[in-house]
Amino acid sequence: NFNSIYQIAEENKVLQRLDVDLIDLNIHHTPINCIQLLIAFLNDFEDRPINRSKVFKYVLKVIFDNPGSLFYGDTIDEENCGFVVGYYCELLLRKNQETFTESDFLIKTKDFCDKHHNTTNVNDLLQILKNNQIIVNFNGSLRFRFSYWIYYFAALRMKDSEDFKSFMLDAKHSLYYPEIIEFYTGIDGRAEDIVTMLITDLNALSNKVYLKLNVSGDINPYTDI
């Protein structure tokens, strides 16, 4: 098994840690997610990731740094993956689309890489993501196995593109996409713009409720108790 091969830590300790992290990080209890968390443990078992952004970063780093069977080229790393796939996830979210074709992914990402003088081999990139079940087949098309991967890569893209960030914060309204907020704030901790947006939007929603109920914001329902 995985731990026998890589000797992460004592068996029961690994199982306990795996169970705790799956619960704490709100990740689906599936075999592939267990494997991906175990991959993240390879980075440093004693270093508990504080959020899912860090877990996914560890997973991608190990996947693309692996010189074995999962590796398909020497021009791809975790940062290139985030840069390229983040752009494609932007396209998906702008079109409210979850599924896509292999040819569309390759054409769009190849054009993007050429435009930015990026040498990433997008065929290899897609194959690696498919082999690690981050992207899977679905009714003749492709999709991300779990939607949180789209939001993770989209959050990376928001860090690179002010235009896309504005789209997600304004037109798309990320207030209703908590995973976008989670990943955006978890990537590097710099999220003053998101906090400002949340405060503004929550105040606006509160004012709408007060107006419809014809009550003031300082009402205390426990006053007469």
Q: Where are the predicted features?
A:
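Extended hydrophobic
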Residues: N1-S161, D170-L175
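Hydrophobic repeat-domain scaffold segments
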Residues: D160-I225
